[in-house]
């Protein structure tokens, strides 16, 4: 019977359907009732899937095409299913002779084989022609073509309605749709039979459309039931770009490929197309099973749904790749990936476990095993380049939701990104990976626009959920995200990573739930107060939210625990207020790096940020600006670590710029302001060793008011530039203060003053003995005229500049012009009594009167302290305890002699440990002293140095300095830098010597081919030969197979003064024995070795990748042997210092450099042969040249950077050796070589290692003498394969360093 050969236009209405959306649910009825998607899924499962799955997945499984499907779903389907369809009649066709002869011939499959058993006719109800198995759709056709070869075309078999068709053509190629497409469908009747069509071929190529379970004709008559199409290939399944595969309601497509080649569907695959218009009103299902595809599964374009709530399922293999995925606005696609170990259930139904008991009246049925949901295996992946939704203008309350669900370990959406088509009433896209991770590389678009807005009156919603079942998955977005107006994004994951910037429009909601969230930059500045406010809802993050930069305007921020590197609060300088609200309790671990308040529009239209509540907020820096406020009054404590800088006042009615409950200025933090202070502190203010920088403007400075208590906490740290205590309050340009008026600096109900140690602990007894803390605080209240201290002057001996500076500070021109007249102040500290300071329980204030003038050496002065040790090498600075005006003038003034201030010696003196200075010099020398100065003083300050030496005894200090100096000497040594290369070279010397011994053999037992030896003697006389053995020896293995390829595993170690260096790697090469006019050995090699080093204290650790390459040769002249060798080496070293003591902790750092070497060697030896050349003794002498070097390096430390310039060295050596070789058999040997190597010349440069200004020069070693012994041998394993082993030991007779290396290798000769 002829079938249609002309292409027909498909003009029937089509829609999308799906099936497996619910297959990943936890259990029936367990989903959240308020979730419309899952609510619909439950109903859909019970009302549609269980009965309808019979015609799709279950029937496919019954014939083995979907084995391994979710077992619980399959079992449920089987419960609802009737018995499998049984054909009334089975027709069989077998391809006979001829079909197996022509592999390049093409056949028409229908005409050649099928037509005899397929009938066709007119379907009056549907007004169309259709085809069926001969004698009725309840029959089956089996086609046996398993021996057939060639290509078989099936084209135009349209409206094949059953029954079953099974074509076995395992050695042939099936080509579907050469001229026209094919349509496989079914008819629904009382039995609801399923049409099953199976093609088993070597290769399958789809050229034209394929329809599965489409209607026949108009569809007005009999409807389609269900159809399963199985395409099985042992090699390749491919569809062309114009070959569309359409799965209609009730369709299942099984793809089976047993090869590792991918299945490539370049044509569009459309799931859920419906047969007729009325079907748009009902759900639908369709399924693709790729679980039996061994290679990757590739869809170029996959569409799900058209104009209905289609549900589709893919039972996938390990890796599924989709180019473009189109989802209809209400469609859903579930991609189920195999669990670890595959789909096969670990538990099987076994009827034998439940035998029938005839004695019982009740019959016990077999146990049914139902598996629950599962996670995809760790290597399962779903890749989608571009995800897109399609929509129409249909209105529905709550809008429509499209969904993509999977259980893969990784769901990856590529650079094509995600597009959500939005229409009135709103659209939502849900992307969920129930058990694994989600990664989105591309952008999020609305209506194909980046930053596109939702349709007016609607919202566009993106939802991403990762690991909902496991609570341990990551959602990652690697591109910028632009959310336009009314576009919302929700992300649920254990860890959410946003590696691009996020830009929020008006009325936008960004919601994240999970354990932690990491953001780059978030810009929420486009929103306005009211309906246009944007929301950052991170309240569902249980641990911490990390944001690099957050910029807000009218923004609601719901966040509990955060670390924001920078918070920028802006009003966009518009004529309406913009207010940011942190609407959650922020707890006690939240932190902001920098708060930047940008200037508002006006007092009436300001901006600001408010915190609803919290226990503690730590801020590094705050920058205030007018008409923009920071209200943290509901946070119990706010701490400032670095800086508060005030701008001009904002004058906002009812709102002051910065508002706190309790505010703490931490150590090293500063607060800068002038005549106005836009600050409210309703609780306590604590200055914990910070600095309040006050700038005089218009003759005044502002007053800091604390609602309750103010605390001034200070220490005895000295300002290294002035010699004074570091001030807590510093008044700049104090000379401009209005005279004779009390200027209140701090006001509180109660002010307390506390003196603490450098590290915050209670200070020592010497300081605590002075109980007048208010007077001590006054020394931390400093007045400056430019950079010159006004309230106290210090004049050092022979220093007129100090007198001039004092005169400029107090406005005394005489002291500036004639400093010689005031030399009586040398060695004194003078107090300016014209300045009155107040520090009591409620007020801190200053009153600047007329500056006093020095008149003599005793009035208002005190002597600078002098050194009390026997050797007056250093000036001392100390706390003045018994000055003449100790409690009335300047108590506890720290005075110093500037030229020796800041030395490590002065710190020891202040600690009353002057004798330890001598110990330091005696045991560690000037180099140890300089190292201590660099680590403690130059890199920190005297206070830090004091803390370190207080915690360390003199003996510990010297021991640690000596260990550090030794380590730094080691670093500077070129011998250390090239140790890995030297060990690698030693290993190769052993291997090369073994190769030369092997190829120098002149002994053999190889006498098997005696006829060849006699042939070689033809026309010669024995008397004309030097030795008859020479003729026989020409048949030794080295002549028959003169070329060798060898490879060795090498290892070595070096021991030197407790340090340990090791190396392991491999070496390989090729060599040959040449027997022409010149008898010689030539070869080349290359090697790699990884070396590691650690010193005895484990404070220096190194790892290096080393390579070595070179050539070698030996020339024979009778018993004389001349050896030549040249090689080069390069090493890349990564080293680190790891000192465990606190004193040396600043030395801990890492660095990288390159080391290199070049070597040439030449030697001469003479062979003394015994026992027919079986034993050879060879003395030899030689010379060598070695060039060593290293590049410069600088460490990654910001505190004490270690650096070293490049180094280079040239070495000349002479050596003498004696070698014993023993040859046995035809190929085996053993040798031992012992000798002495002496350096006789060395010159080059070796730069010092530097720590800032501190330098360590490498120790210059004397010329070295080495003793060396090496031995090795070789055994034959197979005809051309040999095993060799060698060891070498090298000992430095000068430094007592030892080096050991060994090798194990193989050789192949040819």
Swiss-Prot record:
Residues 339-364 are annotated as: Disordered. InterPro entries: Autotransporte_beta, Autotransporte_beta_dom_sf, Vacuolating_cytotoxin. Residues 350-364 have a biased composition (Polar residues). Pfam families: Autotransporter (PF03797), VacA (PF02691). It comes from the Bacteria. GO terms for cellular component: cell outer membrane; cell surface; extracellular region; periplasmic space. Residues 1-30 form the signal peptide. Keywords: Cell outer membrane, Membrane, Periplasm, Secreted, Signal, Toxin, Transmembrane, Transmembrane beta strand, Virulence. Residues 1038-1310 form the Autotransporter domain. GO terms for molecular function: toxin activity. The keyword 4Fe-4S does not apply. Induces vacuolation of eukaryotic cells. Causes ulceration and gastric lesions. The signal peptide, cleaved at the inner membrane, guides the autotransporter protein to the periplasmic space. Then, insertion of the C-terminal translocator domain in the outer membrane forms a hydrophilic pore for the translocation of the passenger domain to the bacterial cell surface, with subsequent cleavage. This is Vacuolating cytotoxin autotransporter. It comes from Helicobacter pylori (Campylobacter pylori).
């Amino acid at each position: 019977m002829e079938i249609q050969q002309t292409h027909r236009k498909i003009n029937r209405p089509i829609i999308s359907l799906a099936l497996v959306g619910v297959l990943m649910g936890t259990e029936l009825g367990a989903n959240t009732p308020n979730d419309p998607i899952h609510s619909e899924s439950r109903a859909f499962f019970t009302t549609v899937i269980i009965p309808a799955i019979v015609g799709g997945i279950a029937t496919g499984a019954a014939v083995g095409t979907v084995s391994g499907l979710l077992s619980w779903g399959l079992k449920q389907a089987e419960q609802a299913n009737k018995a499998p369809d049984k054909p009334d009649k089975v027709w069989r066709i077998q391809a006979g002779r001829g079909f197996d002869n022509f592999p390049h011939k093409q056949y028409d499959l229908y005409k050649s084989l099928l037509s005899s058993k397929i009938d066709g006719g007119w379907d009056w109800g549907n007004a169309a022609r259709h085809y069926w198995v001969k004698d009725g759709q309840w029959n089956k056709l089996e086609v046996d073509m398993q021996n057939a070869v060639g290509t078989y075309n099936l084209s135009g078999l349209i409206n094949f309605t059953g029954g079953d068709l099974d074509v076995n053509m395992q050695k042939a190629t099936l080509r579907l749709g050469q001229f026209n497409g094919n349509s496989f469908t079914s008819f629904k009747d009382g039995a609801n039979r399923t049409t099953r069509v199976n093609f088993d071929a070597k290769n399958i190529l789809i050229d034209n459309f394929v329809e599965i379970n489409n209607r026949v004709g108009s569809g007005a008559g009999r409807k389609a039931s269900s159809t399963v199409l199985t395409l099985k290939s042992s090699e390749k399944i491919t569809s062309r770009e114009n070959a569309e595969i359409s799965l209609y309601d009730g369709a299942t497509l099984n793809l089976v490929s047993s090869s590792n080649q991918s299945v490539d569907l370049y044509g569009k695959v459309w799931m859920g197309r419906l047969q007729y218009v009325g079907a748009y009103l009902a759900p639908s299902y369709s399924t693709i099973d790729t679980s039996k595809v061994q290679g990757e599964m590739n869809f170029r374009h996959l569409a799900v749904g058209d104009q209905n709530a289609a549900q589709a399922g893919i039972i996938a293999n390990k890796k599924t790749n989709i180019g473009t995925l189109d989802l209809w606005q209400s469609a859903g696609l579930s991609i189920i990936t195999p669990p670890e170990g595959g789909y096969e259930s670990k538990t099987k139904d076994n009827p034998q476990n439940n035998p029938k008991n005839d004695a019982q009246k009740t019959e016990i049925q077999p146990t049914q095993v139902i598996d629950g949901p599962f996670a995809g295996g760790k290597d399962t992946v779903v890749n989608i380049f571009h995800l897109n939704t399609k929509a129409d203008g249909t209105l529905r309350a709550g809008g429509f939701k499209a969904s993509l669900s999977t259980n893969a370990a990784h769901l990856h959406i590529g650079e094509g990104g995600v597009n959500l088509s939005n229409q009135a009433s709103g659209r939502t896209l849900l992307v969920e990976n129930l058990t694994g991770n989600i990664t989105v590389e591309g952008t999020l678009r609305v209506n194909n626009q980046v930053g596109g807005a939702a349709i007016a009156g609607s919202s566009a919603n993106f939802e991403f959920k990762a690991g909902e079942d496991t609570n341990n998955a990551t959602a990652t977005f690697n591109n910028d995200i632009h959310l336009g107006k009314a576009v919302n994004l929700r992300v649920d994951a254990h860890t959410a990573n946003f590696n691009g910037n996020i830009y929020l429009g008006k009325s936008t909601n960004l919601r994240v739930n999970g354990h932690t969230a990491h953001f780059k930059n978030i810009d929420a500045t486009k929103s306005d107060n009211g309906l246009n406010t944007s929301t950052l809802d991170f309240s569902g993050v249980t641990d911490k939210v990390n944001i690099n930069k957050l910029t807000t305007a009218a923004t609601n921020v719901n966040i509990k625990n955060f670390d924001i590197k920078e918070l920028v609060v802006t009003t966009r300088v518009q004529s309406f207020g913009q207010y940011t609200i942190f609407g959650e309790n922020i707890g006690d671990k939240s932190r902001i790096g920098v708060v930047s308040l940008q200037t508002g529009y006006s007092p009436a239209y300001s901006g600001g940020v408010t915190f609803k509540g919290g226990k503690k907020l730590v801020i590094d820096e705050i920058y205030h600006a007018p008409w923009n406020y920071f209200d943290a009054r509901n946070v119990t404590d706010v701490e400032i670590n670095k800086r508060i800088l005030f701008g001009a006042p904002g004058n906002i009615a009812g709102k002051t710029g910065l508002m706190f409950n309790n505010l703490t200025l931490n150590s090293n933090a500063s607060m800068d302001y002038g005549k106005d202070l836009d600050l409210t502190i309703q609780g306590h203010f604590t200055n914990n060793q910070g600095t309040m920088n006050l700038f005089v403007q218009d003759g005044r400075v502002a007053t800091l008011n604390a609602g309750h208590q103010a605390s001034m906490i200070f220490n005895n740290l000295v300002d290294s530039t002035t010699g004074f205590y570091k001030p807590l309050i510093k008044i700049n340009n104090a000379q401009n203060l209005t005279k004779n008026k009390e200027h209140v600096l701090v006001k509180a109900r109660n002010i307390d003053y506390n003196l603490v140690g450098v590290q915050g602990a209670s200070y020592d007894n010497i300081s605590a003995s002075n109980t007048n803390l208010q007077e001590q605080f006054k020394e931390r209240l400093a007045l400056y005229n430019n950079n010159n201290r006004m309230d106290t002057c210090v004049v050092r001996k022979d220093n007129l500049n100090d007198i001039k500076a004092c005169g400029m500070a107090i406005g005394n021109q005489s002291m500036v012009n004639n400093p010689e007249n005031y030399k009586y102040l040398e060695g004194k500290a003078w107090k300016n009594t014209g300045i009155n300071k107040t520090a009591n329980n409620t007020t801190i204030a200053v009153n600047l009167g007329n500056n006093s003038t020095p008149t003599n050496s005793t009035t208002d002065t005190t002597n600078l302290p002098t050194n009390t040790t026997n050797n007056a090498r250093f000036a001392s600075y100390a706390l003045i305890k018994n000055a003449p005006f100790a409690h009335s003038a300047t108590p506890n003034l720290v005075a110093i002699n500037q030229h020796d201030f800041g030395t490590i010696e002065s710190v020891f003196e202040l600690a009353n440990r002057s004798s330890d200075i001598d110990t330091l010099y005696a045991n560690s020398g000037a180099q140890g002293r300089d190292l201590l100065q660099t680590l403690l003083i130059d890199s920190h300050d005297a206070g830090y140095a004091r803390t370190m030496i207080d915690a360390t005894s003199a003996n510990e200090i010297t021991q640690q300095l000596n260990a550090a100096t030794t380590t730094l000497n080691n670093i500077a040594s070129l011998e250390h830098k090239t140790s890995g290369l030297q060990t690698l070279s030693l290993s190769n010397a052993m291997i090369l010597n073994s190769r030369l011994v092997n190829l120098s053999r002149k002994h053999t037992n190889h006498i098997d081919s005696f006829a060849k030896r006699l042939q070689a003697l033809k026309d010669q006389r024995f008397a004309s030969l030097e030795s008859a053995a020479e003729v026989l020896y020409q048949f030794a293995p080295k002549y028959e197979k003169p070329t060798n390829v060898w490879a060795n595993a090498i290892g070595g170690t070096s021991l030197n003064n407790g340090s340990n260096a090791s190396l392991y790697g491999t070496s390989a090469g090729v060599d040959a024995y040449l027997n022409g006019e010149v008898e010689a050995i030539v070869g080349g090699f290359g090697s790699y070795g990884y070396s590691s080093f650690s010193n005895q204290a484990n404070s220096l650790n190194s790892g290096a990748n080393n390579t070595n390459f070179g050539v070698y040769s030996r020339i024979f002249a009778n018993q004389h042997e001349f050896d030549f060798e040249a090689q080069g080496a390069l090493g890349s070293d990564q080293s680190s210092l790891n000192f465990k003591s606190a004193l040396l902790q600043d030395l801990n750092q890492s660095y990288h450099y390159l080391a290199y070497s070049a070597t040439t060697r030449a030697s001469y030896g003479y062979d003394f042969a015994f026992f027919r050349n079986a034993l050879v003794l060879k003395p030899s002498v030689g010379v060598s040249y070695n060039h060593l070097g290293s590049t410069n390096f600088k460490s990654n430390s910001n505190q004490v950077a270690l650096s070293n310039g490049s180094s280079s060295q040239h070495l000349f050596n002479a050596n003498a050796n004696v070698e014993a070789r023993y040859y046995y058999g035809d190929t085996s040997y053993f040798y031992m070589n012992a000798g002495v190597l002496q350096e006789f010349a060395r010159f080059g440069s070796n730069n010092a290692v530097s720590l800032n200004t501190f330098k360590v020069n490498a120790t210059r070693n004397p010329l070295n003498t080495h003793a060396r012994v090496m031995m090795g041998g070789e055994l034959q394993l197979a005809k051309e394969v040999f095993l060799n082993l060698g060891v070498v030991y090298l000992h430095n007779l000068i430094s007592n360093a030892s080096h050991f290396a060994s090798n194990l290798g193989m050789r192949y000769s040819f």
